[in-house]
Each structure stands twice: as structure tokens, then as C-alpha cells.
Amino acid sequence: YNVPSIEEFANRIKTTLKKYPYIVAELNGKIVGYAYAGVFKGRKAYDWSVETSIYIRLDNHGNGIGRRLYEKLEEILAKQGVTNVNACIAYTEHEDKHLHNDSVYFHKKLGYKTVGIFHKCAYKFDKWYDMIWMEKFIAEHNADPNDIIPYPMLNC
């Protein structure tokens, strides 16, 4: 696994912010986590669904930062017109120093449901990992949904 450069990471954030929120949590002036949404599938029919990502520094797990980030992220996404949030989570039957399964339990606590498992589809750290897809509905599925409001156009 290669850690992105600062420039690459900044470009990812800029690209995300063209359409979706990118939320950062700070504690005592240091970044301790972030959450954002991205395109779920690059076709018009899927505009109302997004893929979410979250990262919390390991030493800050369990203190509510992740919950607050996701609550804010989902609140903004619902205002944009998003109906479905999806999370693709690495999973292992036997936890190791690179991967624990806390993210699956975290998402379950926030109301996400497992909708699919891809077995041994991700290879990193010299090991095969499963991927679990989880989803949550954050808004009604109207018969004629409005277009998604890009994040920069939203008045939060």
C-alpha cells in the first residue's frame, strides 16, 4: 500500500469538493479524522447514491468522532438530495496488525446493513482481504427525484 503524497491527497480533496462534502475533525489543532462522499457509479441513474469513506486515527477510536463526522456527512448529503449511502469496507476473518473489523461494527451501529460480500478480492500487505458492502437510506425514494445539488451550491 502506497501512502499518497500531500499534493495527491490535496487534489483528491479538491475533486471531491466539486460535488460532495469532505469533513475534517480536529482535536487540539491536529487532524484526527475525516469523512467524505464520492461517486457511487459514474452513470446518471446512480446520482442519488454515493460511496462514503471515513478515517479516524487509531488513538481516537471510540470517542464519538466517527459518529459525529458521519452524522454531519449524512445531514449534508440528504440536503443535496442523496438517498443512499454505501460503504465498501475491508474485512478479514482473522484480524491482523493491518486490519481489524471495527469499521463493520461501527457502520452497523449507525444503521448500515450488509448488502454484499466479495471474498478475497483485495490484496494488500501480502494478504487477501474480503470487501463488505453496506448501505443506509438517508432520505425518501421519491418517484421523480430532484437533481443532486452540488456541495458548493448548497447553503448549509
How should each PLM-predicted stretch be described?
Residues C88-A90, V104, K108-K127, A139-E140, ...:
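Conserved catalytic-core motifs of GNAT/GCN5-like acyltransferases
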Residues F40-T52, H61, A78-N84:
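A conserved beta-turn-beta hairpin within the catalytic core of GNAT-like acetyltransferases
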Residues V24, K30-V39:
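Conserved beta-strand in the GNAT
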Residues G62-K79, H100-Y105, K109:
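Conserved acetyl-CoA-binding loop-helix of GNAT-fold acetyltransferases
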Residues Y1-K14:
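Conserved GNAT-fold acetyl-CoA-binding loop/helix
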Residues S53-H61, I89-H94:
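A short, internal acetyl-CoA/4′-phosphopantetheine-binding micro-motif in the GNAT/acyltransferase core
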Residues I13-L27:
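A short helix-loop-beta-strand connector motif used in the catalytic cores of GNAT acetyltransferases and
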Residues L77-D102:
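Conserved GNAT acetyl-CoA-binding A-motif
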